[in-house]
Amino acid sequence: MLAGLRRRGSMTTPPGPEIPPPHQGGFYSAGHHPQRPWPETPPPKTRGGVKWMLGAVALLAVVGVTVAVTLAVTGKDKRDAIPPGSGVSGSPTASDIASADDSGPVSVITEDPTCAAQGPILETFAAQQSQLWVERDPALGRESWSPELRADYEKVGKAMRTAADQVAQLAKITPHRAMRELYEQFIAYARAYADNIPNYTPPTDNLARVAVTAADAISYICAAVSYGSAAARAPLVENRPAPTNVAPLGNPSEPERFLTAPNPVCGEWSSVLNAFQTDTTEWLKTDPDISSSQWSIEQKQINENVIPIMKRFANQLYLLGKDSGNPTFRDIADLSVQYRLAYVAAIPTYTPADKYLANASIRLATMANVACRAAAD
């Protein structure tokens, strides 16, 4: 079993690397990148061996790996567990949804009662994936599948449906609108992927990528809660203005995809992410498991140099989210911005737990990027 988080409330050093090395080829490489299996137990912590993961890069081809990464950073604190007896029910009313009255600005999440409950759900989902499916080539259409691969796709589709059904209860319980939206989008895209397996074509894979990126973002948000970096850095970030409108409250058990057609900001969003990847090349080479108190002069300079780059990136995402005209897109953008700025605020006194802030931010930005691709296909 993958190592889970064990502590909350104070910043602790993560027990070994959970982040795989980035794949090459940019955000949307035309080439196929083989998928890599994830070890069941994280290797021992080593200095210099683990590099930052720009989530958008790895998510080009990694679906199985991403789910496993989600398990690696899922909180296990039973104090945040879902109340017993709270099963999935029918169409809920506003009173059944804890975040129904959340119409304020999106901010760094310091507490969430669903963080512990997601672990068993995603662990079971990951266990349904065979090595054959993890290493599949998503560019192969259904007509090219072997009988074994066809069976594996169908098995994973069933696992996605099951996970989506279970996550629906978490969407009702979280008190945070943005967290509910992440759960809802996992549900919507996981089911869409499963629905399309009988008629699978290569673009169908983007639906799975959105689902697992949403799950991955949730897990990093919960990791920041569990290791205390969210609580430590959230007070350092000023909230943006409250939105003028939020997405209509629907049934979290039957959510719709937030992008079913290309959004006008999608092209620029992708360009901004590509530019950010290029501009942070040196920073991505640094070891996230070294605290600022132990940085060399070179490491300190690299981190100081990345601050204005990250601030510019955050401002660009904020403006694009606002210009999207899509309340859910805007919330995802704003949440990415808040976690990015929290990371920036952490740099002068950086500890390894702060890496979860940066990883949550890039996963959120990547989620919107892949959703744009899925909508265009």
From Swiss-Prot:
Topology in membrane: Single-pass membrane protein
Deletion consequences: Loss of DNA conjugation when disrupted in recipient strain; strain still secretes EsxB.
Pro residues: compositionally biased ranges: 14-23, 36-45
Subcellular location: Cell inner membrane
Source organism phylogeny: Bacteria, Bacillati, Actinomycetota, Actinomycetes, Mycobacteriales
Note: In the well characterized mc(2)155 strain this gene not present.
Paired cysteines (S-S): none
One Gene Ontology cellular component annotation held by this UniProt entry: plasma membrane
Function: May be involved in the ESX-1 / type VII specialized secretion system (T7SS), which exports several proteins including EsxA and EsxB. Involved in DNA conjugation in the recipient strain.
Region Disordered, residue ranges: 1-46, 77-107
Keywords from the named record: Cell inner membrane, Cell membrane, Membrane, Transmembrane, Transmembrane helix
Name this protein carries in UniProt: Uncharacterized protein D806_0077.1
Entry's transmembrane regions: 53-73
